Amino acid sequence: MNVIAIMNHMGVYFKEEPIRELHRALERLDFRIVYPNDRDDLLKLIENNSRLCGVIFDWDKYNLELCEEISKMNEYMPLYAFANTYSTLDVSLNDLRMQVRFFEYALGAAEDIANKIKQNTDEYIDTILPPLTKALFKYVREGKYTFCTPGHMGGTAFQKSPVGSIFYDFFGSNTMKSDISISVSELGSLLDHSGPHKEAEEYIARVFNAERSYMVTNGTSTANKIVGMYSAPAGSTVLIDRNCHKSLTHLMMMSDITPIYFRPTRNAYGILGGIPQSEFQHATIAKRVKETPNATWPVHAVITNSTYDGLLYNTDFIKKTLDVKSIHFDSAWVPYTNFSPIYEGKCGMSGGRVEGKVIYETQSTHKLLAAFSQASMIHVKGDVNEETFNEAYMMHTTTSPHYGIVASTETAAAMMKGNAGERLIDGSIERSIKFRKEIKRLKGESDGWFFDVWQPEHIDGPECWPLRSDSAWHGFKNIDNEHMYLDPIKVTLLTPGMKKDGTMDDFGIPASIVAKYLDEHGIVVEKTGPYNLLFLFSIGIDKTKALSLLRALTDFKRAFDLNLRVKNMLPSLYREDPEFYENMRIQDLAQNIHKLIEHHNLPDLMFRAFEVLPSMVMTPYAAFQKELHGQTEEVYLEEMVGRVNANMILPYPPGVPLVMPGEMITEESRPVLEFLQMLCEIGAHYPGFETDIHGAYRQADGRYTVKVLKEENNK
């Protein structure tokens, strides 16, 4: 970080010559000097060059107005105002809180001023670095000799082998040196929450509006289990979102708890909807408790917020209405909601305490903020027994954490602190809205078909768009007003083939074909539904990436309309089965898959498959125990009606469990089986389009098997 911007448009010798001297003095201290053309150019530079560490300007020309604009972008940026003897310094105490230092134009003072700028730059870096990351950097710079783990010893061991040297060169020196042992006492302990680790947790809690925060190094899958193990002791009953992540199914397999499922909605596109408000009411819960064997009043509830497709709840309503001691919002997909006013009241940590309740929010820091994979956080608001909670935390946390992951978690929080964090999220929202508008423009101008966007008909400024009962765009039936909102950052594109009400069109382009084309051109889709594709406009998405996606979509339309051969348009798919795809053209492929989906009446089948849950014969915990005792057998998929499932079955997408361990598909819930069979049939007919179904195993003959409990153990 060594870039200094100089606004040098003085036009007079007594101002320009001292600045020229300062330029030379700063270069001797290894600073790189840039000269913005004007105020707007400077602000663009600050926005686009995060390594800028100071701005030098003439006080008479720019004054406080420029300082205020820079401070809104980065309140810690050092500012150096040069004034002459006759300048008027009309500055209040409040103004002096900005990082402004004053110097006088004087020849021969450059060395002294440059040294002060170097000192201020060091202080700036020290100020913006969070505590653990700062301590880690300091330790690495000290270069101590250690006789403890890890065995590669700062990368030295790797360099004793040719292949190890290649590995070392790829990842670099600092990656190796920062991979250190928990024996390094000056960095404290992640497990004991001591030293700089404790300071990091306190820092994160302040940034995320939590009372207590924990860093988790094995993803939100682990964070969810930590919260669940503490909040739901064995023998208790828990309310769980049926659209939960599979980590919560694993929690139920590990802990002997009785689940009662919230039943979310789903529209014709297969987009996951929210849990209706009635599901949170005391009367509804009481009825479910009465209907569920061995259930007692729930002690804990888990809600996925946001949904995979970007729907956020009115969390204030849930916190107020839900009659349980603790509520866990699994917010893996929205770690940024504390940093824009459009998310107020739509996330777990918004607002203050809730009397008599503990609110948890787990977030995948790595998913949409800037952190290494597996970086996650647990935020807490309310009274918990910290010693007992830490037992659950230690149970699921390695004693050898990777300090790079831990430091990246803290750095992600530092990036979101203050005005800079708000600007990052505002930028993501702005880019996503521009992209949405561009898609709508291209659709309006296109001959024939083009992609559409799942959103209200008219969008303008930044907001989370409410799903209303009098609006048709969202495709959900009987929606509650002021309950669910669409996050602008989650962009779902629609392909031709299905209307909002689920009516199938004669012409269709299954989204999986578009996803394969985009993948051929270096663009990875987050999620693919039958006729929709999900794109995440995280803070790492810039204008170039957004334009590349637009270009690829228009290129797909052009190639599709030309009806190119599959082997030319989708070479990777062609290689899956060259003989099958040899003479096939893209329009034939699209129409054939579309007709297969239409044959199965996908919208109706999907609705029925998720409307009636399989019967819970035993808890996931009990079913898993039987599997561990070897009391399972494999049957073909079509034979699973009337059999108790041993494993969860979940298709990707969307990656939420369709059948839980211990559940049985009955005649009433047969549509669940028919939905799975449809997914398998598409893959059987068209090589390369197989659906990844966790819990179903494809055999050599192309048929799928599942694990069920042996008949004598279905008790």
For each predicted feature, which ranges?
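Generic beta-strand/beta-sheet core signal
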Residues: 216, 241, 262, 303-304, ...
